[in-house]
Amino acid sequence: MAGSPLLWGPRAGGVGLLVLLLLGLFRPPPALCARPVKEPRGLSAASPPLAETGAPRRFRRSVPRGEAAGAVQELARALAHLLEAERQERARAEAQEAEDQQARVLAQLLRVWGAPRNSDPALGLDDDPDAPAAQLARALLRARLDPAALAAQLVPAPVPAAALRPRPPVYDDGPAGPDAEEAGDETPDVDPELLRYLLGRILAGSADSEGVAAPRRLRRAADHDVGSELPPEGVLGALLRVKRLETPAPQVPARRLLPP
């Protein structure tokens, strides 16, 4: 080093300047090297305790941390409210869109239902994409509706044959109370012709039995009267009486019972 031409030669000045520059760059800041200057204090001034001097620093450090935590919580709550409002708005928009789509589908279906039907309803469905039936099918597929269930709601259900059968006429013999109406509703349906036939047979049988039994009773009573005591006019009066008794009286037509 002592005989180095860089330090003792003609280039020694340049190398010295380079060393000084390097020392200036790598030198620590003056705040680290400077010693703290103590302020002059009087003898009567008491030095503050270490606890009091350290407490404000901790307080100054804790206060910003608490404020930052509160700000983060407020920001999280605001973000949660914003997300909830956005979710509700999206759900409301989806429900409104689905309702509008169903309304459009029903309106189109009613329009197609009320339109005059052609002889061949399947004609032109495949060729014409703008046909009402094709549009209706696309709308149903888009709305994810069941065409069979929708048609069942629009088409009236067939009336059963029992409801189309004519009911027998109801004969009202007088005012009937609610008990009679309830009893009449509970009775099973019976053919009225069969009822009329049975009632006619019963009435005809009772009338024949009464008509046959009455002349026999009258004949026995007349014979008894003739045998016991004869009238003063003789046998001719008795014969006339028997003849008069044997002639049947005109029968009163029996009342016809009508089905309820």
From Swiss-Prot:
Keyword Repressor on entry: no
Subcellular location: Secreted; Golgi apparatus, trans-Golgi network
Keyword line: Cleavage on pair of basic residues, Glycoprotein, Golgi apparatus, Neuropeptide, Secreted, Signal
Effect the entry attributes to changing G237A: Reduces inhibition of PCSK1
Processing after translation: Proteolytically cleaved in the Golgi. O-glycosylated with a core 1 or possibly core 8 glycan.
This protein's GO CC annotations: extracellular space; secretory granule; trans-Golgi network
Compositional bias annotation for Acidic residues: 179-188
Impact reported for L236A: Greatly reduces inhibition of PCSK1
Function: May function in the control of the neuroendocrine secretory pathway. Proposed be a specific endogenous inhibitor of PCSK1. ProSAAS and Big PEN-LEN, both containing the C-terminal inhibitory domain, but not the further processed peptides reduce PCSK1 activity in the endoplasmic reticulum and Golgi. It reduces the activity of the 84 kDa form but not the autocatalytically derived 66 kDa form of PCSK1. Subsequent processing of proSAAS may eliminate the inhibition. Slows down convertase-mediated processing of proopiomelanocortin and proenkephalin.
Protein name from the UniProt record: ProSAAS
